[in-house]
């Protein structure tokens, strides 16, 4: 709730200064912020030399304790992911209702939420990667997906802004 209030305040503050950020641009920024979270996890895991999930399970308890991340890593990661989610999810649903034809708004909103469900179904890719490779590889793949998604939004930005104007 705190982050939502801060971000809404930021949008209002920018709007009062004539620097309104379009919804498609906010979604692209959200993907970039998620990318920052995954880049942080990639670099941190790489720097710490974290093993794959399979290698971690085979370690002794003493060895496993050495390669566990501190609480601050999770807090920083979740901070970025929460901010990214605030840029993407509610704005995406609002954007869909703006651009969908009146007689198809419900269907289009359902498709937006369905896309989220499909994304959740693809979560098996993470364990597939991190059980066979050092965990930084999984974070790097997620980083790449975020950057590609952000790039796709930015590539369509002018068209999307024209459609919503």
Please report, for each region that a protein language model flagged, where it lies by residue.
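Loop-to-transmembrane helix entry/capping segments in MFS-fold secondary transporters
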Residues: 72, 102-111
């Amino acid at each position: 709730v705190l982050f939502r209030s801060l971000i809404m305040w930021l949008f209002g503050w920018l709007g009062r200064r004539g620097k309104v950020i379009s919804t498609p641009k906010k979604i692209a920024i959200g993907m970039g912020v998620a990318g920052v979270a995954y880049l942080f996890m990639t670099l941190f895991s790489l720097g710490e030399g974290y093993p794959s999930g399979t290698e971690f399970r085979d370690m002794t308890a003493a060895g496993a304790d050495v390669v566990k991340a501190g609480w601050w890593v999770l807090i920083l990661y979740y901070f970025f992911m929460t901010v990214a989610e605030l840029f993407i999810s509610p704005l995406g649903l609002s954007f869909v209702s703006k651009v969908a034809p009146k007689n198809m708004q419900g269907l289009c909103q359902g498709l937006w939420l369905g896309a989220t469900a499909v994304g959740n179904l693809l979560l098996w890719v993470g364990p597939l990667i991190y059980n066979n490779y050092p965990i930084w590889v999984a974070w790097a793949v997620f980083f790449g997906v975020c950057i590609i998604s952000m790039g796709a939004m930015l590539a369509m930005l002018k068209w999307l802004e024209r459609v919503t104007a």
